Amino acid sequence: MATDRRRVLPVLLLVAVVAGGLAAIPRQDDYAGARRRMIEEIRARRDVTDPAVLAALEAVPRHLFVPEKERRNSYEDRPLSIGLGQTISQPYMVALMTSLLGVHRGQRVLEIGTGSGYQAAVLSRMGVEVYSIEIVKRLGERARRTLSEQGYHKVHLRIGDGYEGWPSAAPFDGIIVTAAPPRIPDPLLSQLKTGARMVIPVGNSYQDLWVLTRRRDGGFDRRRVLPVLFVPMTGEAQKRER
């Protein structure tokens, strides 16, 4: 069947223009592919195998938790600046710490150091109720806005010093700390349920990631996981070091 070339040519030109414009703009599908590649890289390291953790990381749009200028790098396995001297942890570290926490749907977790809100979003995606504290007001307000816009309504965010934890909401099924104090804050230990874990980086120039599990007798089993580098915990933690 013959075709009128005069009608086809404008259509082809329009398609070419639209396609050319879209090529310059990252699409949601592009980010989805980048997330899948990020998950494949994490799986390849073989120390994060929890399907719920990996599914949450694949579902949460990390690019929406970083500044616009960092979005092209948002699924690379490295920390990124979120401004005000703070960073968003590398995806592998988020996966590892979440896996070490060992929490499940319906449980409650205290997070010290909301930052961008990404770690809280991952936990919320797993069905965990999150209580998160951020000491930097502007970061906390930005994270609250992002979490609300993305529909993460099981995150309770408070702006303040996280050293004392959140006593009125304690005890928790897990505590995750995303800034390094010189030593482990005793108030946080007291807010763990029996059998619950705290995952925390500890140290000054040299830091290690630790997992502490509360025993029935009130003591703690302590396990050092690996050397890490986190931003320091500010506020009361720094005052007590002087």
Kindly label every feature range from the protein language model.
Residues 22-110, 121-122, 126, 139-141, ...:
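Class I SAM-dependent transferase core
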Residues 10-11, 75, 96, 133, ...:
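Generic hydrophobic-segment detector
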Residues 7-29:
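Bacterial Sec-dependent signal peptides at the C-terminal "C-region" and cleavage site
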